[in-house]
């Protein structure tokens, strides 16, 4: 398996400020996070992802931490 192959996708916002707020909340909690802009039929959306992680297990553990902080997400391969 490739290294850094997994991320946790948290949300996609049409409001990029909301995406930035979530990213900052994650970063403040010690979770590495980043945003990506997606072009969709409904216009641009800003996706918030945490990671990358080297294994699905590491990503799942990080997701457990996010859930404890009141956030939710899904583990996906990059």
Where are these regions (language model features)?
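Extracytoplasmic
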Residues: 14-78
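Compositionally biased, proline/threonine/alanine/serine-rich low-complexity intrinsically disordered stretches
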Residues: 1-7, 11, 17-18
């Amino acid at each position: 398996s490739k290294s850094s192959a997994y991320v946790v996708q948290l949300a996609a916002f049409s409001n990029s400020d909301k995406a930035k707020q979530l990213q900052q909340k994650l970063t403040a909690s010690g979770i590495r996070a980043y945003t990506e802009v997606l072009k969709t039929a409904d216009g641009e959306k800003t996706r918030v992802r945490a990671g990358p992680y080297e294994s699905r297990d590491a990503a799942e553990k990080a997701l457990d931490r996010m859930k404890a902080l009141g956030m939710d997400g899904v583990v996906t391969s990059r």
